[in-house]
């Protein structure tokens, strides 16, 4: 390892800065450009402020794409409308007449 001038700050050491500035390209070469590019572009880790996404407003024209939903009739109980009690009585009466 080459000796480094002790009076030089660490961020000014030779080889500490890449020769070209960082850019917004995400190609393989630019992802490995420097440690910061690798973290941000290669791994997707960013410690900066997160941008707030703006909500999209409703499209002009209001209800152009909305179809009204028809009212459904209230649900009715399924099965025999006479009810379970009358069925039990029928079964009991049939059981008495069989023997």
From Swiss-Prot:
Positions contributing to Zn(2+) 2 binding: 25, 27, 30
Annotated region (Interaction with the host capping enzyme RNGTT), positions in chain: 49-86
Residues with PTM Asymmetric dimethylarginine: 52-53
Biased composition (Basic and acidic residues): 83-93
UniProt keyword annotations, A-Z: Acetylation, Activator, AIDS, Apoptosis, Host cytoplasm, Host nucleus, Host-virus interaction, Inhibition of host innate immune response by virus, Inhibition of host interferon signaling pathway by virus, Interferon antiviral system evasion, Isopeptide bond, Metal-binding, Methylation, Modulation of host chromatin by virus, Modulation of host PP1 activity by virus, Phosphoprotein, RNA-binding, Secreted, Transcription, Transcription regulation, Ubl conjugation, Viral immunoevasion, Zinc
Listed GO biological process terms: DNA-templated transcription; positive regulation of transcription elongation by RNA polymerase II; positive regulation of viral transcription; symbiont-mediated perturbation of host chromatin organization; symbiont-mediated suppression of host innate immune response; symbiont-mediated suppression of host translation initiation; symbiont-mediated suppression of host type I interferon-mediated signaling pathway; viral gene expression
Cellular location(s): Host nucleus, Host nucleolus; Host cytoplasm; Secreted
Residue(s) at site: Essential for Tat translocation through the endosomal membrane: 11
Region (Cysteine-rich): 22-37
Spans annotated as Transactivation: 1-48
Function: Transcriptional activator that increases RNA Pol II processivity, thereby increasing the level of full-length viral transcripts. Recognizes a hairpin structure at the 5'-LTR of the nascent viral mRNAs referred to as the transactivation responsive RNA element (TAR) and recruits the cyclin T1-CDK9 complex (P-TEFb complex) that will in turn hyperphosphorylate the RNA polymerase II to allow efficient elongation. The CDK9 component of P-TEFb and other Tat-activated kinases hyperphosphorylate the C-terminus of RNA Pol II that becomes stabilized and much more processive.
Subunit (UniProt): Interacts with host CCNT1. Associates with the P-TEFb complex composed at least of Tat, P-TEFb (CDK9 and CCNT1), TAR RNA, RNA Pol II. Recruits the HATs CREBBP, TAF1/TFIID, EP300, PCAF and GCN5L2. Interacts with host KAT5/Tip60; this interaction targets the latter to degradation. Interacts with the host deacetylase SIRT1. Interacts with host capping enzyme RNGTT; this interaction stimulates RNGTT. Binds to host KDR, and to the host integrins ITGAV/ITGB3 and ITGA5/ITGB1. Interacts with host KPNB1/importin beta-1 without previous binding to KPNA1/importin alpha-1. Interacts with EIF2AK2.
Name of the protein in question: Protein Tat
């Amino acid at each position: 390892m080459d000796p480094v001038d002790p009076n030089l700050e660490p961020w000014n050491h030779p080889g500490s800065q890449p020769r070209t500035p960082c850019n917004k390209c995400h190609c393989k070469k630019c992802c490995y450009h420097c440690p910061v590019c690798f973290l941000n572009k290669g791994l997707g880790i960013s410690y900066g402020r997160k941008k707030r996404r703006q909500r999209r407003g409703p499209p002009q024209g209001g209800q152009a794409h909305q179809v009204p939903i028809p009212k459904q009739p209230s649900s009715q109980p399924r099965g025999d409308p006479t009810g379970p009690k009358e069925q039990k009585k029928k079964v009991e009466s049939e059981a008495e007449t069989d023997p």
